[in-house]
């Protein structure tokens, strides 16, 4: 899937309208993967910038990942069984700064089937 990230407004877990096309492309790709292998596992990773407390950023990153998962299930029929979420807060900044930076406010996706598969 050739999408770097879905970016968010400051302090928000709502997926902006300008990012919705990415969600649709992600859903299409996930559904194709899952059609080929019903055991696919995809990890949705939430991130924040470094503004605010670590605890607030952790909660926000988890909410961002959960929002994408909900949208994929509700609007695009991606099976929830194949999706997992994690929030990293401000731990993995793309742009190392203590200031607000839109590139750090994101969710990323990772196919982890091969990592967790017992085969």
Q: What do these predicted ranges mean?
A:
Residues 1-9:
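A short glycine/proline-enriched turn/edge-strand or helix-cap micro-motif
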Residues 45-119:
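Periplasmic OmpA-like peptidoglycan-binding domain that tethers envelope proteins to the cell wall
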Residues 8, 12-45, 69-74, 109, ...:
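Periplasmic peptidoglycan-binding/anchoring modules of Gram-negative envelope and division proteins
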